[in-house]
Amino acid sequence: GISFKHFQAWDRRSKFIAAGIYTHAKSLSAKRFLAEFLQKVPFKVLSIQVDGGSEFRAEFEQACADLAIPLIVLPPSKPTYNGGVERGNRIFREEFYARSDFLANSIGAMRAHLTKAINKYNTYRPHYALKGLTPMQYIQNHILKVAA
């Protein structure tokens, strides 16, 4: 098998999720994920909350500063403060990584499968917390209409 690191971003309001697979959990990987995330997210990012891992230092901190996005670093050993991301991690473990047919022998193949899973999550999978809407439906109905 291959070794990879999973990066994930989750919007507390709309439940919109983005994720990426990288070969290392380094600050440069986190910076790259941030750039990819900002290209995908259909609304303005007002702040970013991270768990304080070393991958969210150096290049990542500088990228947030350069973009004028406030960075909120959670205290150590407080996963309850990051409940939405922890829930997202569980969803990916149960609905994506646990399925053997999604596992691949290359990072590129894993990324392709992950992109499909994220699209399904954001576009087709209804969410109880959103009263049966998908994240994209919620964004269109409640975020983009307000901004227009």
Residue ranges, per PLM feature:
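Mobile genetic element proteins and their domesticated derivatives, centered on retroelements
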Residues: 15, 34, 48-51, 64, ...
